[in-house]
From Swiss-Prot:
It comes from Emericella nidulans (strain FGSC A4 / ATCC 38163 / CBS 112.46 / NRRL 194 / M139). It is found in: Cytoplasm. One of its GO terms (biological process) is protein refolding. It comes from the Eukaryota. This is Peptidyl-prolyl cis-trans isomerase D. InterPro entries: Cyclophilin-like_dom_sf (IPR029000), Cyclophilin-type_PPIase_CS (IPR020892), Cyclophilin-type_PPIase_dom (IPR002130), TPR-like_helical_dom_sf (IPR011990), TPR_rpt (IPR019734). Keywords: Cytoplasm, Isomerase, Repeat, Rotamase, TPR repeat. The gene is cpr6. GO terms for cellular component: cytoplasm; intracellular membrane-bounded organelle.
């Protein structure tokens, strides 16, 4: 049994219709027992129906408010918009104490509308938020699933609400082996054991060589996912690799001399691969952007002509998808110069020329109609 006897609970998160992962929490019942017990019981649903006629249970509720570089907020299981919720003690209960501070990311704290108005709504910090000290009660922390929190934090929002529902599909209390293993980081389906964001990395201190090693592994995880037909996951791994590389854009003075060209080459490959997979997902704007990034570092990466040709081709595919056929044709001409015998480039060039011809014919027909 783990030394800590603090309660541990979990949320299984669903984004849209996609099962996303689990967030595990440890609750500080030794500091704020009443507040911790409220959250624990709302995870299990053991208190039954509330005074508002809704189950006292987080299951099925959503994260209704997300502000990047601040926090993600949920717990309104009555109105689902931040105006509702109910504690196990009644609608509201007093602030227990402000002993714990908002001094780091991944803390659990009570949302409120002023002093003594705690209900069921909570938030998870994603950065230190000292301006909330003395106003909101900290009562727990995330011990696993930080990548899930970051995924929610980085979702598109409108008026601070995620544009796709982020739902607590299941929740409860962890016991036995589940309790003991709750804080252990486990690899995902690709074998990736790393946190999604370098700021959350634990273990070996990050340095340029370490980040290069991690990014190289992530490239391989992405390749595996792509080969297995999971294009979205492959793209996630390539982008994650770039996040780790970006922690140290350049090697430091005492790093190996051959590290810099290796880092630049890996950056080129990750951008190029990202463009390929974005295009396959129909994300043509991203496909164009990432191909452009690859070309921006191609010289520094000493990229081979064949690899440059691939990137020009991938940018052309993205531009064609964006109906930017003239730009696509220019990139295909560059690609053809670098790889004159490439059949895919020739086929795409013919297709784009046909599209341009059809567009010009349509424009002429429209002009004739306008002036007739």
């Amino acid at each position: 049994m783990a030394e800590s006897k603090r309660p541990r609970v979990f949320f299984d998160i669903q984004i849209g219709q996609q099962q996303t992962g689990r967030i595990a929490f440890e609750l500080f019942n030794d500091v704020v027992p009443k507040t911790a017990e409220n959250f624990r019981a709302l995870c299990t649903g053991e208190k039954g129906m509330g005074k508002q006629g809704k189950p006292l249970h987080f299951k099925g509720s959503i994260f209704h408010r997300v502000i990047k570089q601040f926090m993600i907020q949920g717990g309104d299981f009555t109105a689902f918009n931040g105006t509702g919720g109910e504690s196990i003690y009644g609608e509201k209960f007093p602030d227990e104490n402000f002993e714990l501070k908002h001094d780091r990311p991944f803390l659990l704290s009570m949302a409120n509308s002023g002093p003594g108005t705690n209900g069921s709504q909570f938030f998870i910090t994603t950065v230190p938020t000292p301006h909330l000290d003395g106003k909101h009660v900290v009562f727990g922390e995330v011990i696993n699933g930080k990548s899930v929190v970051r995924k929610i934090e980085n979702m598109p929002t409108q008026a601070d609400k995620p544009t796709t529902d982020v739902t607590i599909a299941e929740c409860g209390e962890l016991t036995g082996e589940d309790y003991d293993n709750a804080d252990k980081q486990t690899p995902d389906a690709t074998g990736d054991p790393y946190e999604d964001f370098p700021d959350d990395h634990q273990g070996e201190e990050l340095s340029a060589p370490v980040c290069f090693k991690i990014a190289s592994e992530l490239k391989n995880f992405g390749n595996t996912a792509f080969k297995n037909g999971n294009i979205a996951l492959g793209l996630e791994k390539y982008q994650k690799g770039l996040r780790y590389l970006n922690e140290f854009p350049e090697p430091e003075e005492n790093d190996p001399k051959d590290l810099e060209p290796q880092m630049k080459s890996l950056r080129f490959t990750l951008h190029s691969n990202s463009s390929l997979l974005a295009n396959k997902l129909g994300q043509f704007k991203n496909g164009k952007t990432w191909a452009t990034y690859a070309l921006d570092v191609a010289d520094a990466a000493s990229a081979k002509d064949a690899d440059r040709a691939k990137v020009y081709y991938r940018r052309a595919v993205a531009e064609s998808g964006l109906k930017e056929e003239d730009e696509a044709l220019k990139d295909l001409e560059q690609a053809s110069t670098l790889a004159p015998s490439d059949a895919a480039i020739a086929a795409e060039t013919a297709r784009v020329k046909k599209a341009i011809k059809a567009r010009e014919a349509q424009e002429k027909a429209t002009a004739r109609k306008f002036f007739s």
